[in-house]
A protein has these predicted regions:
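Conserved N-terminal beta1-alpha1 strand-loop-helix module at the mouth
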Residues: 1-83, 155, 241-259
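Conserved, mostly hydrophobic/aromatic
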Residues: 20, 54, 87, 113, ...
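Conserved anion-binding
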Residues: 24-27, 92-179
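Active-site-adjacent beta->alpha loops and helix N-cap segments on the catalytic face
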Residues: 63-78, 93-97, 117-132, 183-193, ...
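A C-terminal functional module that forms or caps the active site or interfaces directly
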Residues: 178, 182-229
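Short, well-ordered coil/turn segments that N-cap beta-strands
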Residues: 14-18, 49-52, 80-83, 111, ...
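Acidic (Asp/Glu)-rich catalytic clusters
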Residues: 11-13, 44-50, 73-80, 126-131, ...
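C-terminal helical cap(s) of enzyme catalytic domains, especially alpha/beta-barrels
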Residues: 213-225, 234-259
Length: 259
């Protein structure tokens, strides 16, 4: 079963569209890589029933050196039934991307990954050739400076709309999605009008993205269409299980009103 089918099945089974980011901060979590593993392992144990995916950002594990990679692999084993989405936003020449894809999908055994489209379609194809893995192309990101590049006018349309079109053309194996941030619900709606690809929507927690507006803009009836992601707001909550349940219920309430 491919990544997106697994995501749909788990979403239905757990009644959730929530993804939780696992991004340890050494300034808030003592003990190096071992401390990060302990903290994130507890978060996984508390939240797994409320999520359909976990999203470790590679930089937060790379900062610990080799111990960080080992810790991430151990964390992956903590929740084998839940997909892990490797948020590395890799983007490079084809041969390099081939090595990145091998690292992410074979060595680390991740179920999905984010990629950067700046080098064009041929670089992304090194990831999409793994037919049973998901590949989310960064389209309209959630950071404040995104518009300076992603909103550039290209032949009468913003650049992010061209990225959405490029991603659609790469979806031969039905394993491609888009990253569109919850801080830009109007842009999510614009992309959704032209594309029915699955969306990964980060930014509903500490970044204070628009949860309701984003779900309304993205939802198309497909459970994979609207994977809502929060990281710090859950990871550093006094009780991660309660925060995850709150987010899950909030998302479900919006979806319920749309059905």
């Amino acid at each position: 079963m491919g990544y997106f089918d697994r995501l749909r099945a788990l979403s239905a089974d757990r009644n959730t569209l929530l993804c939780v980011g696992l991004d340890p901060d050494p300034e808030r979590i003592p003990g190096g890589a071992a401390g990060a593993l302990r903290h994130c392992r507890e978060v996984v144990r508390q939240t797994e029933e409320h999520v359909c995916c976990y999203k470790p950002n590679s930089a937060f594990w790379e900062q610990y050196g080799p111990d960080g990679w080992h810790a991430l692999l151990e964390l992956r084993d903590e929740a084998p039934q839940t997909p892990f989405l490797f948020d590395g936003k890799r983007g490079d020449m084809g041969n390099t991307m081939r090595a990145y894809a091998l690292t992410v999908f074979a060595t680390l055994a991740m179920d999905a990954a984010t990629v950067n489209p700046y080098l064009g379609a041929d670089s992304i194809e090194e990831f999409t050739r793994y037919e049973d893995r998901g590949v989310y192309v960064v389209c309209r990101s959630s950071n404040p400076g995104a518009a300076s590049l992603q909103h550039l006018d290209v032949k009468g349309r913003p650049l992010y709309m061209h990225v959405a079109e490029l991603a659609q053309g790469l979806n031969t194996h039905q394993n491609v999605g888009l990253v569109v941030g919850a801080t830009a619900p109007a842009e999510i709606a614009e992309v959704r009008r032209s594309s029915q690809l699955p969306f990964l929507i980060p930014g509903i927690g500490a970044q204070e993205g628009d949860l309701e507006g984003s779900v309304r803009a993205a939802w198309n009836g497909d459970p994979a269409s609207c994977l809502m992601s929060a990281s710090r707001s859950v990871l550093f909550a006094d009780k991660p299980s309660r925060e995850a349940a709150k987010l899950k219920d909030g998302i479900n309430a919006v979806v319920g009103a749309l059905r």
